[in-house]
Amino acid sequence: DYVESLRSLQEKYKDRISLKIGLECEYFPDYLHWLKEVIREFKLDYIIFGNHHFHTDEKFPYFGRNTKTVDMLELYEESAIEGMESGLFAYFAHPDLFMRSYPEFDRHCKLISRHICRTAARLNLPLEYNIGYEDYNDAHKITTIPHPDFWKIAAAEGCTAIIGVDAHNNQYLETPFYYD
């Protein structure tokens, strides 16, 4: 069990490191009661906001592959702001995820990025500068996330950032790309 193994490590290394337990979670309004129960049951230290789907993964496609229209961008913005305003999350992971599939950083992207960043700044909610796709971007000679235009807006709006890797597999952390 994930949490149980981390509790064991917390105890084992309590005099050497401070180990926190958290999960990346969606903002799905219909499941908030369940999510709050999970947080209580497992005594999680925090949860991270990952905005991958609009309100549910049962009806809406993944933003990272399917944000190709202004309508999808607007759904991304709406759920991003709702999730941030929920007060549940410690920070917003990869807030520029829509740029994994949106064709170019156009005026629509600028507008929703400004709205997202202003909300994050107002709430004092950090945004994750996710370097987990840097090696992919480099290998394919493209720019997805972290997207420099989004982060210019985040800086201009006075956002706080936290650096993350989004390592779904620990081998991602062992990639020499990130250490050279």
Label every model-predicted segment.
Residues 87, 91-95, 99:
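Active-site groove signature of glycoside hydrolases
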Residues 58-71, 97-107, 137:
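Surface-exposed cleft-lining segments at the edges of enzyme active sites
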Residues 99-100, 104-180:
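Charged catalytic cores and adjacent phosphate/nucleic-acid-binding surfaces used
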Residues 1-74, 78, 171-174:
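A metal-dependent hydrolase metal-coordination microenvironment
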Residues 3-16, 36-45, 82-88, 115-124, ...:
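Acidic (Asp/Glu)-rich catalytic clusters
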Residues 54-61, 79-87, 126-133, 162-169:
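Low-complexity, flexible helical/coil segments
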Residues 19-23, 47-49, 91-93, 127-129, ...:
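Hydrophobic faces of well-ordered beta-strands that scaffold small-molecule active sites
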Residues 73-80, 89, 113:
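Hydrophobic, well-ordered secondary-structure segments
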